[in-house]
Amino acid sequence: MSLNDNTNLSSHTPMMQQYLRLKAEHPEILLFYRMGDFYELFYDDAKRASQLLEISLTKRGSSAGEPIPMAGVPYHAVENYLAKLVHLGESVAICEQIGDPALSKGPVERKVVRIVTPGTISDEALLNERQDNLLAAIWQSTRGFGYATLDISSGRFRLAEPTDRETMAAELQRTNPAELLYPEDFAAMDLIENRRGLRRRALWEYELDTARQQLNLQFATRDLSGFGVEQAHHALRAAGCLLQYVKDTQRTSLPHIRSLTIERQQDGIIMDAATRRNLEITQNLAGGSDNTLASVLDKTVTPMGSRMLKRWLHMPLRNAQTIALRQQSIRTLQDLNDSLPPLLRQVGDLERILARLALRTARPRDLARMRHAFQQLPQLNNELADSDNAHLQTLRSQMGEFTELRELLEHAIVETPPVLVRDGGVIAPGYNQELDEWRALADGATDYLDRLEIREREKLGLDTLKVGFNGVHGYYIQVSRGQSHLVPIHYVRRQTLKNAERYIIPELKEYEDKVLTSKGKALSLEKALYEQLFDRLLPHLAALQDSAAALAELDVLTNLAERAWTLNYSCPTLSDKPGIKLTGGRHPVVEQVLKDPFIANPLSLSPQRRMLVVTGPNMGGKSTYMRQAALITLMAHIGSFVPAEQAIIGPIDRIFTRVGAADDLASGRSTFMVEMTETANILHNATEYSLVLMDEIGRGTSTYDGLSLAWACAESLANRIKAMTLFATHYFELTTLPEQIEGVANVHLDAVEHGDTIAFMHSVQEGAASKSYGLAVAALAGVPKDVIKRARQKLKELEALSGSAASTRADGSQLPLLVEETSPAVEALEALDPDSLSPRQALEWIYRLKSLV
């Protein structure tokens, strides 16, 4: 039976009636219904949870004549189960008991106190500390898209208005939201259908006027012109839907969301989804984080610094002034690299602690960590005090010291607080006199009980008399069964044991009531004092958030300074003249993975040398050479130093890569279709200021189709678009392009054959490669010798069929399509005169030719 079958509430027990009413308010998400020490789920929720969480599915009696499916999780372990559900893209409504069971005539009063969704979590246990966790909303019209993202764990609110599908796909790839809200009539479902955490929303939630009202109310403004988003109608619709969703799920004010920013394409270097994937910036092609650019560059010591660095990597800047400030700071911080990281490490994740403070969900240990962070600020300020770097002084000023707040927390919170306020013992002794008095009363019970036991034992002469406490029956006086007949009449029996009797007397009962009252009073007062701490901290929230942002940036810059020093990076020069010139360029990731020294290579692109046709053997390093150019360019535009002896980089507006491909089975697209789609995107959107990497265009179809496509694409990039292009190919016909198109040059990666083996030199040389070494690479890979031998025979046949090992060039002249390897046996036969041989000599020649073959 499903929940929907139970429409007649009167046929259910009172408790199930309460559950069904609450569930009706949250029909699409799981409801965790608190019952004692467990959160229970019923009906379809129970079945779903048992599968997702791999917990037992049981039954709880029956209601309306049917057995009720039930599953449950213990309340003390709920965070682990919530983390698993959130990771799977599920949302959960948490229903707590808010009434007093002792005063309730029917079921204890319950209500949903919070809703946990993948995009709105702020609990430390549910978050990946080194990765942003974003909630996003999307809107679409005939004129483009609106897109809004919010990191509720920091308050960072961003808008964008992608104009086309490719740009929207790139934004989704860049931001990778944990939860995505979309309107019920959303047309471009293929863009989002494979994403996690999808939430379908009603159209009215995207109403523009309502969005403006919501945002003005949140920011306490009359209009949104101060944020520069007044005309961003599509993005505002998405932002309004997103903000209302957060308010509905969090059920509290959101003071840490203080502003919103629109991100415009012209502010940064644009990279489409394929480029971000191919460059393996934060995620490798297998979906992991090993051997990515972030894995090499991210040695930050705070989680908030790690998250900021990843945002920088995914949004390289075009603002030369900001980049220069970062470069100067990195240069200065190389001298402070020993002293700052240990201090910054102690700061921890202040950004997310402040978000929990704003949501009033911060736990005692959050406040202890905040206190510890404040304690590092004076020393951090001292370390930067003597620097003449203007940007570092700005960060120093923004960090502040918060002496008053530090002293408040030092006075208010114990050194090592418990996990939860309800456990008690959070507020430090001496902070509040009334609390100290109640605690003294509760804590004095042991002394009182010892005195009472001695007094009663001596007065009655009962050597077996003991005074104790039991969690069920409370305080008691215990006497052995053999002496129980000697107790006075005012001893009232409370419990009978096998060998003893337990009693209560009026004096002990009075003291018990007093102690229990004092414990309750102390805990109640402690909770109130804890809430008052929030009230005293929250007025400083804006300054605290600015401080956290400054500390995160200082961590990133210090980290990049350490990376530059440790990995021998140099400071790049950003020029206003078009082109890229690298001396001794290295791939930042590959050089860390290799056991052998990395072979550094130059790169020279300019308006007079716009395209390099890159040839050479498979495994020779063509893809590495191309990718390192893109990664060095990207690193330079986040302000980082780069792996090169020298780097001079001109204006760049976009980076495109067409490097490798796999079948997109989910969309029904073959490898070749994926390749052509990515190529079309480049040809439509690249400009003369773009950096384009094209690797093996046309290999997914027949030889002549592929060659024709590769030729035409190269011509378009060099003649029409004039983009800075690295064009790797196995089509040797393309090496004639420099003879026909101005601004095109050949380079190749060298290799040397030694008999049946091949040595890759990984060194970039001017000019075209002499051959592809395909069969040599196959032999190196372990292809059986008989297969290699057969391949050589077949190669000769194909070369013969194509016209004496030559194929027609695209311009009508001749060029070998497959380079022929001359056989020693053929050379010997060509030099032989059969008419001059004796029978014995002919036999000897047969054996010699056999050995040559």
Curated annotation (Swiss-Prot):
Gene3D superfamilies found in the cross-reference section: 1.10.1420.10, 6.10.140.430, DNA repair protein MutS, domain I (3.40.1170.10), MutS, connector domain (3.30.420.110), P-loop containing nucleotide triphosphate hydrolases (3.40.50.300)
Coiled coil stretches, renumbered: none
BP-aspect Gene Ontology terms: mismatch repair
This protein's UniProt keywords: ATP-binding, DNA damage, DNA repair, DNA-binding, Nucleotide-binding
Annotated residues for binding of ATP: 616-623
Family of this protein: Belongs to the DNA mismatch repair MutS family.
Function description: This protein is involved in the repair of mismatches in DNA. It is possible that it carries out the mismatch recognition step. This protein has a weak ATPase activity.
Protein name, as recorded: DNA mismatch repair protein MutS
The gene coding this protein: mutS
